[in-house]
Amino acid sequence: EYGIYGGLGTPDWVWQNPNVTNVTKVVFDPAFANARPTTCYAWFQGYVNLTSIEGIEYLNTSQVTDMHNMFLNCYHLQTTDFSGFDTRKVKDMSYMFYNCGSLESLDISNFNTSEVTNMRGMFYHCIGLTSLDLSHLNTSKVSIMTEMFQLCINLLSVNLSGWDTRNVGSMTKMFEKCKSLKTLDLSGFDTREKTCSMGGMFNTCNELTTIFVSDKFAVGTGV
């Protein structure tokens, strides 16, 4: 057992567990529901052999503002129910599912992202995912989408309809090496208000033949 508040306001298990690579299952006790963490930064970072999380419904995230690196390098984590996450106060989701290569499906349909500003590398190298419906995400405050889907090499479709991209300043390598994408609908993207860096945005998207955009899509620097 570990205390919930350790270094940098994160639980003791983040910094004081030398055996993270041996952990295959995490179980949240019902008593954990009484805790009100303010950050989930790096909670399971480096748990490379973690396959399942039980009792995640007892994790109350209503006060959490930071989820970056939360599951970074949880390469063997399989389908997990995130539907109970309260993300209304979260501002940073960068690298949240970075290198979660065994996730074959990801339901974050209940995520409220109205305060999120950083989605950098959020799904980086999620090679198990073949489709993502993210049309519900509120991206009105997001300024960074760098590397968001980079190396999602098996992603066949991604629904980004309804996204508000007026505040995004970087889409660098956003879809780089999404080698299986054939079409991409960015018709809702508005990049006129910011000078948006787009370097390598579609690098090595070898199968991508069609990109739908509107007259609101101003080609940024580095494309």
Segment roles from a protein language model:
Residues 21-35, 49-65, 75-91, 101-117, ...:
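Structural signature of tandem-repeat unit edges
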Residues 41, 68-69, 94-95, 120-121, ...:
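Register-specific detector for alpha-helical tandem repeat solenoids, activating on a conserved position
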Residues 1-36:
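LRR flanking "cap" motifs
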Residues 10-12, 40, 160:
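Intrinsically disordered regions, especially transient/low-confidence alpha-helical propensity segments
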Residues 13-15, 43, 163:
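A residue-identity detector for tryptophan
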Residues 38-45:
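Non-membrane alpha-helical segments in proteins
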